[in-house]
A protein has these predicted regions:
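Two-component/phosphorelay signaling modules centered on CheY-like receiver
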Residues: 9-28, 94, 113
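A Lys-centered signature of the CheY-like receiver
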Residues: 8, 99
Length: 122
């Protein structure tokens, strides 16, 4: 499972990025939505995990752009404030994770996504 992780805080980006690695997961991290679009353009990632508040283009705008190309893409929006029911209306595979989150929450979410992706016929 290929994960694109977008986080502007360098310490969080490095730590969370490393913690998401392993168990069939490859993580590519970047600091902004604009870089994420470039990285995703060549070979789309299976999952986008992004902070909502980013410099320049926001994480929500990034998610909308990527979902426009692939409405079934998995997206995890990480935010320090409640997003309400908004993300669920964007597509069936969009989830929100409230910051600060426990690593177990992220792990459980990614495990569920991995299982769902593995069950999709290729």
């Amino acid at each position: 499972m290929r994960i694109l992780y977008v986080e502007d805080n360098p310490e969080l980006r490095e730590t969370i990025g490393m913690l998401m690695e392993g168990e069939g997961r490859m993580v590519t991290s970047c600091a902004c939505a604009e870089e994420a679009l470039v990285l995703d353009a060549g070979h789309p990632f299976d999952v986008l995990v992004t902070d909502v508040s980013l410099p320049g283009m926001s994480g929500t705008d990034l998610a909308r752009r990527l979902l426009a190309n692939d409405p079934l893409r998995w997206v995890v929006l990480c935010s320090g404030y409640e997003l309400g029911s908004q993300p669920g209306s964007w597509g069936p595979n969009v989830r929100a994770l409230l910051k600060p989150f426990e690593l177990e929450e992220l792990e459980q979410l990614l495990g569920g996504i991995h299982t769902a992706l593995a069950s999709v016929p290729t």
